[in-house]
Amino acid sequence: SQLSEFARTGSEPAFRQLVARHFDLVHATALRRVNGDRSLAQELAQTVFTDLARQARTLPTDTILAGWLYRHTCFQA
C-alpha cells in the first residue's frame, strides 16, 4: 500500500498519492466539524496530513487509513 511504502521509504510521491486519494474525505469532514469555515477546514486538513507524515512509521500495519484520517480530523477539530 502507499501508506506502507511511505512509512518504509519516506517517498514523497507515495505521500502525494495518499494526500490526493484522501484529501476530499479529510477536507469534507473538517468542513462539517467547523461549520463550513473553508479556511479553517483547509488548515485542519494540512494539520491532519502533517500528523500522518510524522506518525506513519508508528501506525500499525493493519491500520485502515480512511478510518484513521476521519478520526484524527474529528479529534483535531
Name each region found by the language model.
Residues 26, 30, 56, 69, ...:
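Hydrophobic-face residues of short alpha-helical interaction/recognition segments
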Residues 1-5:
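Extreme N-terminal regulatory/targeting segments of RNA polymerase sigma factors
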Residues 43-50, 63-75:
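Structural recognition of an alpha-helix C-terminal capping motif at a helix-to-coil junction
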Residues 8-17, 27-47, 57-63:
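Short, charged helix-capping/linker segments at alpha-helix termini
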